[in-house]
Amino acid sequence: MGSQASKGGVAVEGKAAAADPAAVKTNGQENGHVKTNGDVSAKAEGDAATTNGSAEAAKESEAGAGDAIEPAPAAEGEAAKPEGEATKETPKKKKKKFSLKNSFKFKGISLKKSKKNAEVKEEAAAAAPATEEKPEENGAATEEKKEEEAKAEETPAAPVETPKAEEPAAKAEEPAAAKEEAAAPAVEATKQTEETNSTPAPSEQKE
């Protein structure tokens, strides 16, 4: 107010305000300032009584309070272009999909399967079932080998017995052959027991 006192028209305004106090109060202004005194309804109704363009600024601030992120209308065209460019870049990123089938490289380490590794794994996988089957075959094969060995030992003993010059040697071999023949029936007996064990029990056949 001190600055207004230096003006020449201040005294006239003061007299007009004193002469017509009712007009000043109905307008809600005193000396160019808005008096609210807790009366918010004047702002809500959109009273245009404010001066110096403060009403427009208030409306903009109220509108901006809802969306403070919105750019100014002049900048919308400029802002839309970078957004459009950003949307063009995002489909490029979406085209790259994560897949376990693709090879990965971490600082020079390649996790891609090579043909050699795949072949080794296939051979190992093929060897595993073969080794599982071999124990069954091995059991039968060992029995067959024992029988063949026993027969092979018996057959050479027979030709040795035929020459008459080697009768003393043949007599020494005969007890050995007799022992082998005795061992052969024992092998056959064990074979029969194993065969009976290898045949499934009736309860196992039902399953």
Swiss-Prot record:
Consequence of gene loss (knockout): Morpholino knockdown of the protein results in reduced head and eye size, a ventrally curved body, and enlarged brain vesicles. In the craniofacial cartilage, the ceratobranchial arches are reduced. Formation of ceratohyal cartilage is disrupted with an abnormal angle relative to wild-type. Morphogenesis of the developing neural tube is abnormal, with a smaller angle between the walls of the hindbrain neuroepithelium at 24 hours post-fertilization (hpf) and in some cases a partial opening in the dorsal region. Some deformation of the midbrain walls is also found.
Classification via InterPro entries: MARCKS (IPR002101)
GO molecular function, one term: actin filament binding
Biological processes, Gene Ontology terms: actin filament organization; blood vessel lumenization; cartilage development; central nervous system development; neural retina development
Domain of life per record: Eukaryota
Keyword Cell membrane attributed: yes
Location of this chain's protein in the cell: Cytoplasm, Cytoskeleton; Cell membrane
Expression (tissue specificity): Strongly expressed in brain and eye. Also detected at lower levels in muscle.
Effector domain involved in lipid-binding: annotated segments: 93-116
Keywords from the named record: Cell membrane, Cytoplasm, Cytoskeleton, Lipoprotein, Membrane, Myristate
Residues bearing a lipid moiety (N-myristoyl glycine): 2
Residue ranges of the region described as Disordered: 1-207
PROSITE patterns: MARCKS_1 (PS00826)
Function as written in the Swiss-Prot or TrEMBL entry: Involved in the control of cell movement by regulating actin cytoskeleton homeostasis and filopodium and lamellipodium formation.
Protein's name according to its UniProt entry: MARCKS-related protein 1-B
Taxonomic source organism: Danio rerio (Zebrafish)
